[in-house]
UniProtKB/Swiss-Prot annotation:
This is Respiratory supercomplex factor 1, mitochondrial. It is found in: Mitochondrion membrane. Cytochrome c oxidase subunit which plays a role in assembly of respiratory supercomplexes. Associates with the respiratory chain complex III/complex IV supercomplex. Signal peptide: none annotated. It is a multi-pass membrane protein. Residues 6-97 form the HIG1 domain. InterPro entries: Hypoxia_induced_domain, RCF1. GO terms for biological process: mitochondrial respirasome assembly.
Length: 145
């Protein structure tokens, strides 16, 4: 049996590979850069609202609360639009991850079965050796007796 991997429908897609959490994070930011921008805008508006509240500037406070709402709306829009735009790719990635998990599970199962077969063979060999030794002992006893 050769060690070459079986062909896969994911071979044509080099972006499908096992990735670390950091790689996934950077990939997702690259795929949907508007979401972090929305988070940043919302956070900045909240920070400015906090500063305005501490300074007692109610006009700026209300303006920043409105900016926070706009930041939330922008972020929500980016999430929904990105979900629609990248929906098919996410389904493919989930299929790939499921196939990868099944492959890993099958490899574990195959390794376990191989180990059981090796142990079974060792046990049979031991029994055959033991039976041969026992027969040789009986024959030696017959010759002596």
């Amino acid at each position: 049996m050769s060690n070459t991997p079986l062909p896969s429908s994911f071979d044509a897609h080099p972006e499908f590979f096992q990735e670390t959490k950091w790689q996934k994070f950077t990939r997702r930011i690259k795929e949907e850069p508007l979401i972090p921008i929305g988070y940043a805008a919302t956070s900045y508006a909240l920070w400015r609202a906090y500063k305005s509240m501490k300074a007692g500037d109610s006009v700026e406070l209300n303006r920043m609360f409105r900016a926070r709402i706009y930041g939330h709306a922008f972020t929500l829009f980016a999430i929904v639009a990105g979900g629609i735009y990248y929906g098919q790719e996410r389904r493919q990635r989930k299929e790939f991850e499921k196939a990868l998990q099944q492959k890993q599970d099958q490899e574990k199962r195959d390794a376990w079965l191989k180990e059981l077969e090796i142990r079974d063979k060792e046990d049979k060999d031991w029994r055959q050796r033991h039976a041969a030794i026992e027969m040789a002992a009986k024959e030696a006893e017959k010759k002596r007796g």
